[in-house]
Amino acid sequence: MCHTAIIRHPKRYYRYKQENRKNNIEMDRNRLVSVIMPTYNAGKFLADSISSILDQTYPDLELLITDDGSTDPVTLDILHKIEERDSRVDVIYLDHNHGAGYARNKSIERARGRYIAFCDSDDRWTPDKLEKQIAFMNQKQCALSCASYIIFNLNEQKSVGINIAPPEITFSMMKRDNKIGCLTAIYDTQLLGRKYYMPTLRKRQDWALFLQILKDCKVCYSYPSQPLAVYCRRKHSISSSKISLAKYNIAVYRSILGYGWLKACFYFAFLFLPTYILKLMKRKQDSYCFVKRKG
């Protein structure tokens, strides 16, 4: 374990908890899903997110939460209580904030499951997400899958849109823009032959991860028919921080794809930006139709 990871329990209790966890979670490793969740001062949103995972109809799961140096007493209280109450939950505490990619990697290191899934601490899953998506992956024999998701405005407390995933997502498509919602993604370590970790970028680390996986498995299949997750948004409009993503996009092109500075800038300006704008336009149209259907 990295020296920055501090488990805030006495060593004796921690050893007991780990042994008890192994004994109590009688799961087939071939079916086990390790759910990766980073959190940082998530407060009141955290409890709903955790509940949406632990209440899944799919029984074989473990939830690995890495607290990325939270200072919020509400967040820490929720984590301590849920870890003591449910043996499927394992919490790693970091002594200061490192970023979501680093936090996810600490959980991935601890993961025991064949499948690795992701959910952030303010997002939610539908109750049957894992049951449906794992069955879909087995049917398709695919190593990477995702799904569509609903966009929920926390300020207004209502669904305001939908992001519809393409049926198939290739490496070539992903070079233009991230088309996989991290909160819906699952990858199969057995088919891929290993675990994959996120680059420790402050942003766009999920896109970088999926590019790495698609280099090997070639295609990601999207679950059809219905959304399987809820992305919780706290603002109506796109954050101004989106502008700062330019440097992280270029960093992904350079570090993951090995492009030089000029080629990375070219891809960003002439491939990413046009694709990103078209994606936003499509999402707006899909969301309008979704909200209108809901009445």
Protein language model annotation of sequence segments:
Residues 31-33, 54-65, 86-90:
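Short loop->beta transition adjacent to catalytic acidic/histidine clusters or analogous donor-positioning motifs
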Residues 42-55:
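Short, well-formed alpha-helical segments that are part of the catalytic scaffolds
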Residues 67-77, 96, 120:
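A conserved acidic beta->alpha catalytic loop
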Residues 94-111:
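Glycine-rich, basic loop-to-helix element that forms the pyrophosphate-binding segment
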Residues 109, 164-248:
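Conserved nucleotide-sugar donor-binding catalytic segment
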Residues 116:
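Short aromatic/hydrophobic "clamp" motif used to bind/position activated sugar donors
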Residues 120-124, 148:
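The conserved acidic donor/metal-binding loop of glycosyltransferases
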Residues 128-159:
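Conserved donor NDP-sugar-binding/catalytic core segment of glycosyltransferases
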